[in-house]
Amino acid sequence: MDRPSVVTIGVFDGVHVGHQALIRHNLQIAQRFDLESVVVTFEPNPLEVLRPDDAPTRLCELSRRVELIAGLGVELVEVVEFDADLASQTAQEFAQAVLLDRLDARHVVIGHGFRFGNRARGTAETLREAGLTVDEYSLLGDVEPVSSTRIRAAVAAGDVVEAAAMLGRPHEIAG
């Protein structure tokens, strides 16, 4: 890392309009404070490791997700392998090892209600306790929050117009 960073963390499946707003907020902070803009995403989706029978169908594969995130102007897309070892890390261990040691984070931008670490015990307060400045950014849509779950439901129902509105682009199927 050339300089300290502002980090946004999430799976970002589909890189929908809510994700895009969160990442744009990251970019604004990076510019304002001369920080490197970093997005952390996980591969595979944590649910594919923690509850494989309940893991959702992906809206896009990792390569497309990275391409979409990078296309927003982020300087680094850091793909963190999600495995049993990472799943067992406490939130404090993750903050220290990934955010502070690996990415030299000073600032973190997260969506409202963001949780991380073993048993999802880490919160915005955990990040603050690690010495990070935290921005909790709301991902609200029209009535309900935009979410990958809502997009999957729209796609399953054949509502490509609604899916495209939430994605900010037409839904794609790779194959």
Residue ranges and their predicted role:
Residues M1-G175:
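Nucleotidyltransferase catalytic core that binds NTPs
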